[in-house]
Amino acid sequence: MMKKFKLIALLLCVAAITAKAQKQCWTINPETNAIEMILSDETIPYSDHIEMSGEMVSFVTRWNIDEQKNFTQERSLVFPMLRTIPNNTHASLMYRMQTDIVSLLGVNGLAPVQLGTKKVSINGALRVVSQYGIGVVNTGAARKRAPSPVVEITYTGFPSTTLPMMCETYEVKNITGRTITVIVPEFVQKAKTDPEKGVDGSYIIQAEIYGNGTFKIEPGKSIEFGAAFQAYREKNEKALTPDVKAEYAKRMAYVKNSIDGSLVLETPEKVIDTEFRFAKIRASESIYRTKGGLMHGPGGESYYAAIWANDQSEYVNPLFPFMGYQIGNESSLNCYKHFARFMND
């Protein structure tokens, strides 16, 4: 009995020490219900990841903020309807891209240098506000001059609701007292997969910038452009040209109508309410339009476009009718129909 008591006491001490050592890295915006990162010396460096999905795509963004508060990311793209060999339940095309879109820009003829992250928030999309600077012509003593702040760039990453692509928007704001020139270049990056490893032969994974051009931006003003990361079959398909701004509007409409429009949890604890809201987003977005109909998949770079037994039938399917979520209801009914084909009489 005494040994048991000592063990319990030890576990309680460890739990107390662990709780004390944990840092609060996020706060809840009471007006938008977004979660916002606390950027301080106590919370950085920081690394994290988040998965978001649409009917034809899923992606995991692995992102990091280093000691200088600079943001970097790696995109792990998943295309559940582009099947690989062996064509089993895990046979989704997957590809990682670390393309740094901002590094491709020209600001007054110079490459922008990141000077730190000002804000990180999540609310149906990952939004990062960072400051960038430029130096001067690299001659003589100018080599030693630190870059001067020139632009503030707001990055927003999110999935298309219906297309096989991850979308990104970039807002470039002039934070100087003079007019600057920003060049958004034409840019296409393609990768072709091994035809022997694809059910439909080779697949093309493509990154592209939309809204390129040369822009003069007055003080306090901004411009916007977009980028998308997509995949398609080489044999009989072509790259899509999305309206990235419209895709963002569709994503936010889904959050507003399907998530915030029904089954809203209200308790004395805002953290619990927010956890439930984000759980609704993840549960309801992760539904894929397969050849066999709409199917829910837990994700995690492993579980897509298939029947995952109790994950669907027991855990998530009963939620959708309470949400009034039609796509979820359709995927639930489809799941049970597939189950019925294998049930005993």
Predicted regions span which residues?
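Short amphipathic alpha-helical "recognition" segments used for binding
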Residues: L7-L10, V172, Y315
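A periodicity- and composition-biased signal for non-globular, repetitive helical segments
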Residues: A9-L12, A16, M81, T89, ...
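Substrate-binding groove/exosite segments of carbohydrate-active enzymes
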Residues: K256-D345
